[in-house]
């Protein structure tokens, strides 16, 4: 199937089931499993307010998977448009949302033809022998996959790092600004998949002696995923329309810029490890700032990030309380789990002060692989993960 057919084929381009399952960022705490329950809550809120369109807000979008559902549900079936305000502090999240929350109906025939042409050209570009100055290949991949050196970072294969550099050069130097996100977002998704990690970038797999990087580590896990070739992909979109406002800001500052909403969703960071350590390389790829200073450290993460208060043992509770008190919404939806910094009982109390509280357990037999320092201090290692959704009715 060629690019034009992809854009016009309802099975692949305007299919909500595919839209909510494919081209999703590999992300810690990804809420894909929550979608059915959140969809039911959206219906409940619409019924409670006796309206078919909603104004929805989301303060911590992350991978953007729940954002996709909200965009598709804000409006009604008669094309009366709802509004969706979506925010995250990370640049890669803004790029993902700018792409995937675009309605296919908002792309003109000219837009589609231009995108098809760009995808054709970028596929040709990555096959050319002329290479841009290495950036990802220089700092986060070995020079040779067959001769990895102890001093080399091994986040990507040498081939994929070269492809990433080529695609980033093309996107940032040749593609018009209005189209950049449609090529960059699918690339970010692929970079989150085809890398030499367990799903987050705080560390990469090494050999048995931990002396140098090794694809799949000593057990050679997930080699097909890790070494799978990165290729340009058309973004999957749907025809659902809404008035979408994408932001990249601190969530408290963002709240000052939006009006009261019908439904606000918060999925804050849970543990002490900041997301900007776990996913720093996605922001590196998103920003493509080749002039930034890369430190001679294990990860090569630039020292330009700040720790979120939600990842602080001392500040998380007060920060969350301030957030809830400041939120202007008829309903607030929150997701959190029993391994988080804020104890469930204290979170209950904060939300109960805001309005009538409905607590919805989410059954999950998994164990939390990302316990973090906070959980270790509480000696909760290997306890069963309990996840919850809270719906707060804030109406007087």
Task: Identify the residue ranges that each predicted region occupies.
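S-adenosyl-L-methionine
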Residues: 1-9, 13-59, 65-69
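SAM-dependent nucleic-acid methyltransferase catalytic core
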Residues: 9, 15, 34-40, 141-278, ...
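Glycine-rich S-adenosyl-L-methionine
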Residues: 284-323
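Conserved Class I SAM-dependent methyltransferase catalytic core
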Residues: 307-354
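Class I S-adenosyl-L-methionine
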Residues: 344-348, 354-396
